[in-house]
UniProtKB/Swiss-Prot annotation:
Transmembrane segments: none annotated. It comes from Moorella thermoacetica (strain ATCC 39073 / JCM 9320). Keywords: Isomerase, Magnesium, Metal-binding, Phosphoprotein. Binds 1 Mg(2+) ion per subunit. Gene3D superfamilies: Alpha-D-Glucose-1,6-Bisphosphate, subunit A, domain 3, Alpha-D-phosphohexomutase, C-terminal domain. Belongs to the phosphohexose mutase family. This is Phosphoglucosamine mutase.
Length: 444
């Protein structure tokens, strides 16, 4: 990765690591690179509900217009909607201003190509080179050659209609609780599930700019679990701040994570005549129970490094149409080019409606090995990963679990965090191993 672009675009604390000056330069450089030698570049721009979104959007849009680019503003809208709208509106690129599930102080800028995919590394590197250049030699048109901004007010409705079009049946009578994380799903999620006929109840659907992801959404499903049980609902869906991921809750209040959702979707498609490509792409963090359930059904499981960009790369290479992460970031390539929590949620409820089976029963198809995940905040994640003390602790843990489980340690792609994972047959043993790893990592 370069100095600016990480695994998920450019991220930082808004107004510090990601100031409006940088957003302006990214707008200029991005528009110039993506325009190539063609006519005026047309760029879709959307954002989530963060308080810093107005500031960064204004700077980014100014940068695009300053090189003659045309901006199609779609407002507060999910990240996957920006990817889809970029293609639907025939734009040359899309940009979303969001830090997904990160805290409110953070924000990010992520580009999509005309085809709705994340930009290839060489294109990001060229944008970064221009942004960091000592002199700005990009065009500065004047008069009628300046860019314009168009508000695309129908954008949310276009995306809502697209998501609903992926459903083969209605959801009449199904009680659904939606946790919108006070984020980008707040407008579109209720409309989608109500249009499909579900009886919808809402949690965390009143964004104020500062409450996005705060004790809610896919990273904090506790209140959704309680609400599903209290209402006697069939299912709950928790999105993150930009709705590119979703976690479900069954009728008993139990969390159904991305591994289980992928298993349910894959097994249903296999039963209905076969999953296109015959395989599912997951990361090394996926529970081994997923591998057991899918291989028993005759499906292949491909593993990648952690990160949706690596999942997508393998999907495109292998012809898979389903892939994703335990976190609920699931890519359904038949419907969108990136992880889409709304489409994933609709497809999960389609399986429930088609089979007439409760979610808890569908989820039981995946046996689950005990797995413990812990995030440890560190000063320098690269230095921490290279620490002899941590490496020795990991080696000892792996030796203890040899042949019976797994130990994974990796740096976050977007935060100063080391992620620890242990998996095996005995939870008490795993807790002891994790306590030792966490003690070492916390001291780095």
């Amino acid at each position: 990765m370069g100095k600016l672009f990480g695994t998920d675009g450019v991220r930082g604390v808004a107004n510090q690591g990601l100031p409006p000056e940088l957003a302006f330069r990214l707008g200029r450089a991005g528009a110039a690179v993506l325009a190539g030698k063609g006519d005026r570049v047309r760029v879709v721009v959307g954002r989530d509900t963060r308080i810093s979104g107005d500031m960064l959007e204004a700077a980014l849009v100014a940068g695009i217009c300053s090189v003659g680019g045309q901006v199609l503003k779609v407002g507060i809208i999910p990240t996957p909607a920006v990817a889809w709208l970029t293609r639907d509106l025939g734009a040359d690129a899309g940009v979303v201003i969001s830090a997904s599930h990160n805290p409110v102080a953070d924000n990010g800028i992520k580009f999509f190509s005309a085809s709705g995919y994340k930009l290839p590394d060489p294109v990001e590197e060229e944008i970064e080179r221009l942004v960091l250049a000592p002199e700005d030699n990009l065009p500065r048109p004047v008069g009628v050659d300046l860019g314009r901004v168009k508000e695309v007010t129908e954008a949310p409705e276009r995306y809502i209609a697209h998501v609903c079009s992926t459903a083969g049946r209605g959801l009449a009578g199904m009680q659904v609780v939606l946790d919108c994380a006070n984020g980008a799903a707040c407008r579109v999620a209720p409309a989608i599930f109500q249009r499909l006929g579900a009886e919808v109840s809402l949690l965390h659907n009143v964004p104020d700019g500062t409450n996005i992801n705060v004790r809610c959404g896919s990273t904090h499903p506790e209140s959704l679990q309680a609400e599903v049980v209290a209402r006697g609902a069939a299912v709950g869906l928790a999105f993150d701040g930009d709705a590119d991921r979703v976690i479900a809750v069954d009728e008993k209040g139990q969390v159904v994570d991305g591994d289980v959702i992928m298993t349910i979707l894959a097994l249903y498609r296999q039963e209905q005549g076969g999953l296109p490509g015959g395989q599912v792409v997951v990361t090394v963090m996926s529970n081994y129970g997923l591998h057991q359930a899918l291989t028993a059904a005759g499906l292949r499981v491909q593993q990648t490094r952690v990160g949706d960009r690596y999942v997508l790369e393998e999907m495109l290479k292998s012809g898979a149409v389903l892939g994703g992460e335990q976190s609920g970031h699931i890519i359904l390539l038949e419907h969108n080019t990136t992880g889409d929590g709304l489409i994933t949620g609709v497809q999960l409820l389609q399986v429930m409606a088609a089979t007439g089976r409760p979610l808890s029963e569908l989820a039981a198809a995946m046996p689950r090995l005990p797995q413990i995940l812990v995030n440890v905040r560190v000063g320098d994640k690269d230095a921490a990963m290279a620490s002899p003390a941590l490496q020795a602790a990991v080696a000892a843990a792996r030796e203890q679990l040899a042949g019976r489980g797994r130990v994974l340690v990796r740096p976050s792609g977007t935060e100063p965090i080391i992620r620890l994972m242990v998996e095996g047959p005995d939870r008490e043993e795993l807790e002891n191993i994790m306590a030792g790893l966490q003690r070492v990592a916390s001291g780095l």
